């Protein structure tokens, strides 16, 4: 006879659950005083009690920095490519009048007060990125998860650092087959799903066994959609919960 007892909900004990404030996308930024992925934006998110989502890139000398773009043109006015620049090369640039932060600097600032979602911009360099990431994270004792569009990184983490919570970032542009391949390879413990895909039936199926967070929640309409179909909001601007 089949038991009438329902299976436990794996989302109920999600160690990365940020609570009602959700995750501030690239910190709490406004494009003026508080620039995305800056220590000021992260400090503002901390003040608001929000979790922090941010982007990580690897420099030419294997240092992990907090930066979204592949080059420094949009934020720093220089075409310097991050992957071809050393940390010393990048030290002359500023983000909102402050140096580009490193991952250790972010960890020191947060100090376990809120959960972190760390999106690794791997760019086909998993074998360098993985060890550099582990070295930066090793002393940290706060809550965090590492995620990537590239399913090879969570797979690498499963093999080499199974204690790190690993996630897959999923856009709405993936076909069903490519998404299945990515999910199978990554074997994620959580998903970060594009707002354009969050209402699709496959997300509801996945949520029976994994938490699914939603990016990027920017409007009240996005917020309502994410409230129905996601376990946490990754938000900015008017998407704030």
Predicted regions and their residues:
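Phosphate-group recognition and catalysis centered on beta-loop-alpha active-site segments
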Residues: 1-241
């Amino acid at each position: 006879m089949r038991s009438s007892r329902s299976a436990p909900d794996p989302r109920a004990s999600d160690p990365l659950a940020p609570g009602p404030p959700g995750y501030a996308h690239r910190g709490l930024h406004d494009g003026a005083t508080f620039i995305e992925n800056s220590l000021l934006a992260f400090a503002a998110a901390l003040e608001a009690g929000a979790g922090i989502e941010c982007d990580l890139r690897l420099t030419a000398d294997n240092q992990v920095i907090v930066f979204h773009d592949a080059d420094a043109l949009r934020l720093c006015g220089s075409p310097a490519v991050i992957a071809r620049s050393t940390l010393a090369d990048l030290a002359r640039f500023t983000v909102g009048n402050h140096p580009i932060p490193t991952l250790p600097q972010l960890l020191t600032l947060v100090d376990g007060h809120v959960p972190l979602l760390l999106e690794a911009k791997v760019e086909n360099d998993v074998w360098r990125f993985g060890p550099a990431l582990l070295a930066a994270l090793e002393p940290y004792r706060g809550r965090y998860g590492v995620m990537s569009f590239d399913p090879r990184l969570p797979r690498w983490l499963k093999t080499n650092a199974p204690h790190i919570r690993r996630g897959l970032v999923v856009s709405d542009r993936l076909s069903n087959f490519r998404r299945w391949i990515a999910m199978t390879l990554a074997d994620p413990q959580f998903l970060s799903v594009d707002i354009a895909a969050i209402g699709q039936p496959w997300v509801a199926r996945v949520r029976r066994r994994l938490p699914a967070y939603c990016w990027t929640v920017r409007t009240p309409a996005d917020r309502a959609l994410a409230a129905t179909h996601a376990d946490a909001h990754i938000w900015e601007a008017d998407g704030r919960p």
